[in-house]
A protein has these predicted regions:
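Short glycine-enriched nucleophile-adjacent loop
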Residues: 158-170, 175
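Alpha/beta-hydrolase fold active-site neighborhood
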Residues: 228-342
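Catalytic-loop region of hydrolases
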Residues: 12-102, 406-407, 414, 418-421
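A catalytic-pocket lid/entrance helix-loop region that shapes and gates access to the active site
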Residues: 171-232
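Alpha/beta-hydrolase active-site loop
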Residues: 124-143
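Conserved alpha/beta-hydrolase
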Residues: 97-114
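Alpha/beta-hydrolase fold nucleophile elbow
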Residues: 145-155
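Short beta-strand/loop motif that positions the catalytic acidic residue
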Residues: 363-365
Length: 421
């Protein structure tokens, strides 16, 4: 009889990676997650200070999703601008991770979803604080993943990638911001001009014709609009007539942002039901509701990230509002922040860094995306050897490496692989 060979094992053995994550400074919880793309995937919850300059002011719990390709593989630091919900999907794999067979360290942005402090003190929602969060995660996880690191993000996440580079230059080996704006004010002003030039004259005319038709039929469509908002339980900070106007104005930006096709725009001869269904499908009034999971973004936009305005002049005859000035503050900001001033310090700092320095950055934009109007393409000049710009012809806010024309795509991949050598 071999008695010594009998062992009692735990139901699930903790892997070396899980054990190392659990030993990280300020790690609160490490939870295995299901993945069809990685052998190991975990939710890591860290405790981080609200104010990195004064940790005694309190802390919050910060969610990070770690997807493991190998200790010897490069690591992609995803500088998410919003919540991490989609990163929890079993099939999630970020584009660069797929291309480079790399680990993913996905950082949910502070004040979004599971990384929202309680109480929600808006004072600590700043770009610099979010950059410090990323720097801290980079330092902690760098002990586990000692290879090359690349930071990347999409849209607001792309902006976050660039501001991370601004505050912590050299923290990683390269940066890949996708479709990220660098806005200079609450209503930047460049987007309206962009929308007057984007696409063809026929496409722009089709967009404006639809906006006009929606406004002309206001009396017939408003009962449907009211019923829809009531059924959904939407609450707004402005009268419903103004929300209707804003939806009509938003349509042009949304149309180009998401790469819609002009042949899908209904003719002016369609029924009220057909017109309304397309309208709601294109611009759901949920975007303008009082409180959403993206409220924190609008606080940031109003404080220092900036946003876009609307050109009301072509539609003035049909609008119920005189203009849309200051709509960001009136429609989106919580009541306690209605007097919040915009601070251009962040814009100036990012502009100065991107203009003067030449870090390893690959910027990716879509030519037809309105956010490209306030992007950082201007920072890439012939004298710079490391900063590179790629603009997809006809591309939208959905532009990715995979959507680029093949020669452009190959050049992007070669540049990024060069950082890993």
């Amino acid at each position: 009889m071999v008695l010594a060979a009998v062992f009692v094992l735990p139901a699930v053995a903790r892997t070396p990676l899980q054990q190392r994550l659990e030993k990280l400074e300020r790690a609160i919880e490490v939870t295995p997650l299901e993945s069809t793309r990685f052998d190991e995937k975990y939710e890591l919850v860290l405790r981080q200070p609200l104010d990195w300059q004064a940790p005694e002011k309190g802390s919050f719990t910060h969610r990070i999703v770690v997807s493991h390709a190998g200790f010897d593989r490069p690591t992609i630091l995803v500088t998410e601008g919003y919540g991490a919900k989609y990163a929890y999907r079993p099939d999630y794999r970020e584009e660069l991770s797929q291309l480079l067979d790399a680990n993913i360290v996905f950082v949910e942005h502070r004040y979004f979803l599971g990384s929202t402090p309680d109480p929600r003190d808006w004072h600590y929602l700043t770009a610099e604080a979010s950059a410090c969060d990323l720097h801290d995660v980079r330092q902690l996880l760098g002990a586990i993943y000692p290879g090359k690191w690349i930071a990347t993000g999409i849209s607001k996440g792309g902006t976050t990638t660039m501001l991370y580079a601004t505050f912590f230059p050299g923290d990683v080996d390269g940066y890949v911001p996708y479709v990220g704006p660098v806005n200079r004010s609450r209503e930047d002003g460049r987007h309206e001009k962009f929308l007057r030039r984007v696409g063809t004259a026929d496409e722009r005319a089709a967009v404006e014709r639809f906006q006009t038709e929606v406004l002309r039929r206001r009396d017939r469509l408003m009962p449907r609009f009211e019923a829809y908002c009531r059924e959904k339980g939407y609450e707004f900070r402005a009268p419903l007539t103004e929300i209707y106007d804003l939806c009509a104005l938003e349509y042009a930006f949304s149309f180009w942002q998401w790469g819609s096709n002009s042949y899908e725009i209904p003719a002016t001869s369609v029924t009220d039901d057909e017109l309304f269904d397309y309208f709601i499908g294109a611009v759901d009034p949920e975007y303008f509701v009082r409180e959403t999971p993206t409220t924190s973004f609008f606080v940031q936009a109003a404080r220092e990230l900036g946003y876009y305005g609307y050109d009301t002049r072509p539609l003035r005859k049909y609008l119920s509002i005189r203009n849309s000035k200051d709509y960001l503050r009136r429609i989106f900001l919580p009541d306690e922040l209605r007097d919040l001033d915009f601070d251009r310090t962040l814009y100036r700092r990012m502009h100065r860094y991107l203009k003067r320095e030449d870090p390893n950055i690959v910027m990716i934009y879509g030519a037809n995306d309105p956010w490209t109007a306030s992007g950082a393409a201007w920072a890439v000049t012939p004298r710079k050897r490391n900063m590179k710009l790629f603009v997809q012809p006809g591309g939208s806010h959905r532009t990715r490496i995979a959507t680029l024309p093949e020669p452009m795509r190959e050049e992007v991949i070669a540049a990024i692989r060069g950082w890993l050598e």
